[in-house]
Each structure stands twice: as structure tokens, then as C-alpha cells.
């Protein structure tokens, strides 16, 4: 009897004893449930004999809240949350049990003793033992007292609380509290997992794994978990498991990894610094202008050019940012140096100086920080006196050097703009260099690890001499305005009355000579072969067509060296015949052929500066297009014999289009 009393007392005090000094004592400080009592008496699972447990009965439902019937019976399930060892701060195992099948004999026996008040004892069958690191418990519906269980395989179950008649009313509130303990908010999760202590360390199975697994239903695809290899819990190790380590350990990041992440931002900062130094050089040059005397205006112009170079440097900085992001070198040190320079400027550390030289027209502005920061900024503009030509140069630069431990870095940004008489050059670049010395414990012969990142952008604009000169007149206007085009160029001569008389006389002579030559050519047409006819007819037709157009307009083409060649032609055409003339265009061609002219050439250049200017404003692609037209009219006279003459007119027209294209990097 004493032993029986001791057993009953220990059995009743079992939950209180195991939940003493437990973190969730308020939840587990309850009386024994059916499953816990069965595990305590059965002895099959000694690990759960004195383990604190919290259990309740549920019915399985669908996601919509409908009851799932199996063989016209409600499917009951007992859910138990247990801890395999009192040392653990939180429970780590979930047990699932269902009512066991009653034997037929036991059922028959129950029919006979139905009215006598003797009921068969209800037994449970333990079906599942799941570590809580692979289960995510959440509240599905608070009003209907429904829970949601999601396993690591992706399957999801919905359970509705089905308490007994003698259960407490706030039973579901305890389940909500337990869910909160197992799945704390994200802030608590981070603070508990990253800063574990001996008393309040949180097992990572219930914090981080839940964030890795997604939401899904029963048919969702199984999702892998990084902790699947740790499926064995304290339940299988007899509760003798060491405390878990931190959820996320902070690993040291090398300088190269940090540089790869911030290379774009650092290069952009260098470009912005160069752009800021560019406009600053403009006011400095303007201030030094009055002191420079005659070079003051040129210095102001150079200051504006420096501002333009600064804007170009900003564009180059963006390009350098993209190049730096892909290079993955130590550009982060350049950003650190830029921040140090900004702090030094805010503290009043940097020193500024401006120097002006009146004779050379040079303005220089420097900014240097304290020796500890190692940041230097430079802006300079240089112009030559007006008598020596239009030459202007502007340069903006910034250099930084930093050394932290065994790492040393150098960063430099430079922008320059040079303007000459016919060439305008804008350059911008950024360079970053980092070197890491080998560790002290490493090999002494190892060379330091160095990295270099360079970004460069530039544009060149060439001004052709034709832009300064007036545009040459068109060929159609040369005749009326009296232009004489030679190989060297074109010049305008005044038409006098004597020249007009000479032209009239020449026209009359040409008409008379053409009539005579046409008569002789008709008599000599039978001497030529059919092959020569087919070969010459096309060229003669083209010449005759142009002659008609010129005659219809009333303008005759002017050609040099007319006097000497005209008399020779008149003396010869009377005795020689014409070859290969078609009957249709014979009369007009003969009139045209008798006009003997010299070489005519027109070289016309039409630049399109608008396309180049707009591209320069964009800072992208500079395109200079030149259209070159070459028209050559050649009339040659060749003598073969005394009785025959070969005369032909060759007209060649060539069009050349030259495109100079420069693309920025």
C-alpha cells in the first residue's frame, strides 16, 4: 500500500515535477493527459516517461473548414508537444496519436455490459514522432479554434480543437501561447538566434528553418531544408545532446568581396567629385581673370571649358561605375577616402589656394586635406595669349590614398578639356588600385595581392576648315554669276562688255563650223563598222541630251583655254569625217562636239556641323559627316590619221560620302 500511494502521488505530481523551473511552465503545468498516462504506464518509450507534455484532441478538417470523413467517421487525432529533456529551453518533439482499433471480442463484450456502467478503457496508438524543426505550427482561424500544420515535405494539415467536456475553456489560448513560443516574431528570432547565452539560447530548428520553407498545400512539391541531415534529435539520442550553436555566424569578408560589392558606388563617387571640382574651377578662373590683365577673358573662357569638362567627367564617372562593378576590385577604399575627405572638409581641415599668372594666363586651384587622410584635389586652367592662337586647357583631378592594416589603396579621378583651333578634346578617367600584403603567418616569399581598375571615356571633335569659310556656290549658279572653277579653287571675275562680244562671235563660228562638219560626217558614215556604232551611240546620246538642256536654259558652259583650241578645231573639222553617229542625234551631237573645252572640275565640300554638335552635347557618339561631290567633265580630241578623226566626250560623276564616327567607351 505504501508503494501504491507513492506511485499515485508521483503520478499525480508528475507534470508539476517535470515543469518546475521550465520556461513554459504555465503551459505544461497541467494534469496528465491520456497519451502521457499511456506512455508512462506502457514503458515503451522511456524517454517520454518523465517528459513535460501538452496535449489536446483535434479533428482533421480541410482548408475551408469542412470535416473530413473517413468511412463515415470523424477522424480524431491527438496532438502532443513534448520536450525530450528538461535542459532544453523549448519543446522539440511533436507526437501524433489516434484511437486504437478495438478488438471484435472487446466490442462484443461491450455490448453485453452496455447498461452496467462498465466502459472499456480508451487506448491510443502512437503514429507519428516528428521533430519540431521540421514542423511549422500556426493559427489558421482564431474564432473556430483551428490550427495549421505544415511539414518539411510540403504537406499541410488543418486541425480543429475538439476538447472534452471537462477541459478548461481557455484551452485554445494555451495553444496560441505555445505557437508563439515555438514561432516567435522576426525581431525576437534574430535577437535570440544571433546572441545565444547559456540560459536563453534558442534552438534554430524553430526559427530559421520556418523562413526557408514556403507555404503550400498537401499536393505541393516537397521542399528541401538545410537541416534535414540533422533529423536525429534529442529524442533519439536519449536527451544527451549539446546545446545548439548560433543560428547565423558572421564570417569575415575579405577586402576583395567588399570591393566587388561597392566598386560601382565608389567609382560613381569619384566621378561626382571630379564633376564638383569642374564647376569650382570656373569661378576660380573668373576671379583670377581681372588680375591677369589681357589674359583675364581667356581665363574665364577656360573656366567655362573646365565646367564642361567637369560634366563630361561626371558622365565618365557613371561609365566607370559600370566598369568598376564588373571588375570587382578594391574600389571601396576610394569610397572610404572620399568619405574621409568629406569629413575633413566639414571639420575645416582642408587648405585651399589659388594662384594666377598674368603672363601665361594660367589659373591653378588646389585643395589638400590633412596628412592623415591623404586626399588631394586639383583644378587648373591654362590659356595662351590671343596673339598665339586659340588654345585653352582645363584639368580637374582628385587623388586619394588610404592604408588600413595590411591593405593599401589608391584612387584617382581626372578630367581634362583641351580646345585648339580645329580640335576639341574632352577626356575623363578614374583609376583604383588596392594591394593586400600576405598574412604574417603565411609564406614570407608570397607576393602581395594587387588589383587595378581603370575606366576611361573621351570624345574628340574636329572642326574642318570649311566651317570657317563661306560655303561654295552651287554648280548651277556658276555660269550666271561668272565663276571660273579651276583645280586650285573658284574665283569670281567680272564680265565686261568685250567678253560678251567675244562670246557672241564664238557662238557664230561654232554654228558655221558645226554645219560644215555635219556635212562631211554624213558622207563618211559608211566607213565605220557596226561594232563601233553600238559602242559610241550611248555616250553620244547622253551628251546630246545634256546639250539640249543647256541650250533650253540659255546658258553655255564656260571652259578655260578656249582661244588656242578653238582655231585648231575649226581648221581640222572641215577635212575630217565623224565616226559612229546615230542618225537621230547626229545634228545635236555635232553642235555639242565642236565646242572644245578644257578640263572642268568642281570639288564641293558640304559639312554638317549640326549632327556633330548635337552628339557632343549628349556626350555619347560624335559623328562628323562630309559629303564630297566630284564632277568631272572631260572632252578629249584624238587624231588617228589625216582622213579620220576620233572625238569623244566623257562625263564622269563620283559621289563620296565620308563618315567619321567616334564612340565613347
UniProtKB/Swiss-Prot annotation:
Stored InterPro entries: GARIL-like_Rab2B-bd (IPR022168)
Post-translational modification Phosphoserine, affected residues: 652
Origin superkingdom: Eukaryota
GO cellular component: Cajal body; Golgi apparatus; sperm head
Disulfide bonds: none
Residue ranges, compositional bias (Basic residues): 514-538, 554-566
Alphabetical UniProt keywords: Golgi apparatus, Nucleus, Phosphoprotein
Ranges of biased composition (kind: Polar residues): 219-232
Protein name: Golgi-associated RAB2B interactor protein 3
Organism whose genome encodes this protein: Mus musculus (Mouse)
Record gene name: Garin3
Amino acid at each position: 500500500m505504501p508503494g501504491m500511494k507513492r506511485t499515485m502521488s508521483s503520478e499525480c505530481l508528475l507534470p508539476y515535477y517535470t515543469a518546475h523551473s521550465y520556461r513554459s511552465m504555465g503551459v505544461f503545468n497541467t494534469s496528465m493527459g491520456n497519451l502521457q498516462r499511456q506512455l508512462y504506464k506502457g514503458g515503451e518509450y522511456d524517454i517520454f516517461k518523465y517528459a513535460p507534455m501538452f496535449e489536446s484532441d483535434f479533428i482533421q478538417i480541410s482548408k475551408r473548414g469542412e470535416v473530413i470523413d473517413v468511412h463515415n467517421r470523424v477522424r480524431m487525432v491527438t496532438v502532443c508537444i513534448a520536450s525530450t529533456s528538461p535542459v532544453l529551453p523549448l519543446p522539440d518533439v511533436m507526437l501524433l496519436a489516434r484511437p486504437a482499433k478495438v478488438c471484435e471480442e472487446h466490442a462484443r463484450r461491450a455490448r453485453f455490459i452496455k447498461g452496467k456502467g462498465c466502459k472499456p478503457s480508451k487506448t491510443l496508438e502512437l503514429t507519428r514522432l516528428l521533430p519540431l524543426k521540421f514542423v511549422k505550427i500556426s493559427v489558421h482561424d482564431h474564432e473556430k479554434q483551428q490550427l495549421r500544420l505544415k511539414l518539411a515535405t510540403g504537406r499541410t494539415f488543418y486541425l480543429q480543437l475538439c476538447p472534452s467536456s471537462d477541459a478548461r475553456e481557455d484551452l485554445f489560448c494555451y495553444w496560441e501561447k505555445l505557437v508563439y513560443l515555438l514561432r516567435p516574431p522576426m525581431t525576437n528570432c534574430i535577437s535570440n538566434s544571433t546572441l545565444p547565452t547559456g540560459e536563453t539560447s534558442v534552438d534554430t530548428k524553430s526559427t530559421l528553418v520556418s523562413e526557408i520553407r514556403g507555404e503550400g498545400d498537401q499536393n505541393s512539391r516537397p521542399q528541401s531544408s538545410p537541416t534535414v541531415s540533422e533529423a536525429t534529435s534529442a529524442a533519439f539520442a536519449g536527451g544527451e545532446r549539446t546545446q545548439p550553436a548560433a543560428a547565423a555566424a558572421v564570417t569575415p569578408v575579405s577586402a576583395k568581396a567588399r570591393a566587388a560589392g561597392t566598386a560601382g558606388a565608389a567609382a560613381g563617387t569619384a566621378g561626382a567629385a571630379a564633376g564638383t571640382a569642374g564647376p569650382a574651377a570656373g569661378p576660380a578662373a573668373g576671379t583670377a581673370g581681372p588680375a591677369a590683365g589681357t589674359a583675364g577673358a581667356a581665363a574665364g573662357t577656360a573656366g567655362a571649358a573646365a565646367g564642361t569638362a567637369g560634366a563630361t567627367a561626371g558622365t565618365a564617372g557613371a561609365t566607370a561605375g559600370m566598369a568598376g562593378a564588373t571588375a570587382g576590385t578594391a574600389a571601396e577604399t576610394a569610397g572610404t577616402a572620399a568619405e574621409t575627405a568629406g569629413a575633413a572638409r566639414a571639420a575645416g581641415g582642408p587648405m585651399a589656394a589659388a594662384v594666377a599668372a598674368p603672363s601665361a594666363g594660367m589659373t591653378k586651384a588646389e585643395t589638400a586635406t590633412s596628412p592623415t587622410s591623404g586626399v588631394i584635389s586639383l583644378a587648373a586652367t591654362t590659356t595662351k595669349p590671343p596673339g598665339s592662337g586659340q588654345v585653352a586647357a582645363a584639368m580637374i583631378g582628385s587623388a586619394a590614398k588610404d592604408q588600413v592594416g595590411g591593405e593599401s589603396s589608391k584612387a584617382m579621378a581626372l578630367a581634362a578639356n583641351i580646345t585648339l583651333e580645329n580640335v576639341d578634346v574632352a577626356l575623363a578617367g578614374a583609376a583604383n588600385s588596392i594591394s593586400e600584403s600576405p598574412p604574417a603567418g603565411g609564406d614570407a616569399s608570397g607576393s602581395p595581392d594587387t588589383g587595378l581598375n581603370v575606366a576611361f571615356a573621351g570624345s574628340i571633335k574636329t572642326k574642318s576648315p570649311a566651317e570657317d569659310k563661306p560655303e561654295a556656290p552651287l554648280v548651277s549658279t556658276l555660269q550666271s554669276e561668272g565663276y571660273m572653277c579651276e583645280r586650285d579653287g573658284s574665283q569670281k571675275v567680272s564680265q565686261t562688255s568685250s567678253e560678251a562680244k567675244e562670246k557672241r562671235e564664238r557662238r557664230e563660228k561654232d554654228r558655221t563650223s558645226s554645219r560644215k562638219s555635219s556635212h562631211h560626217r554624213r558622207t563618211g558614215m559608211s566607213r565605220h563598222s557596226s561594232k563601233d556604232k553600238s559602242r559610241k551611240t550611248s555616250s553620244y546620246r547622253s551628251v546630246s541630251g545634256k546639250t539640249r538642256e543647256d541650250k533650253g536654259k540659255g546658258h553655255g558652259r564656260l571652259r578655260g583655254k578656249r582661244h588656242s583650241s578653238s582655231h585648231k578645231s575649226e581648221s581640222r573639222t572641215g577635212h575630217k569625217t565623224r565616226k559612229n553617229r546615230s542618225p537621230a542625234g547626229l545634228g545635236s551631237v555635232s553642235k555639242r562636239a565642236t565646242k572644245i573645252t578644257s578640263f572642268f572640275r568642281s570639288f564641293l565640300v558640304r559639312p554638317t556641323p549640326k549632327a556633330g554638335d548635337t552628339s557632343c552635347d549628349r556626350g555619347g557618339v560624335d559623328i562628323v559627316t562630309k559629303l564630297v561631290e566630284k564632277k568631272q567633265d572631260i572632252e578629249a580630241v584624238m587624231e588617228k590619221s589625216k582622213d579620220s578623226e576620233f572625238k569623244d566626250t566623257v562625263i564622269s560623276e563620283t559621289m563620296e560620302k565620308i563618315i567619321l564616327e567616334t564612340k565613347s567607351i
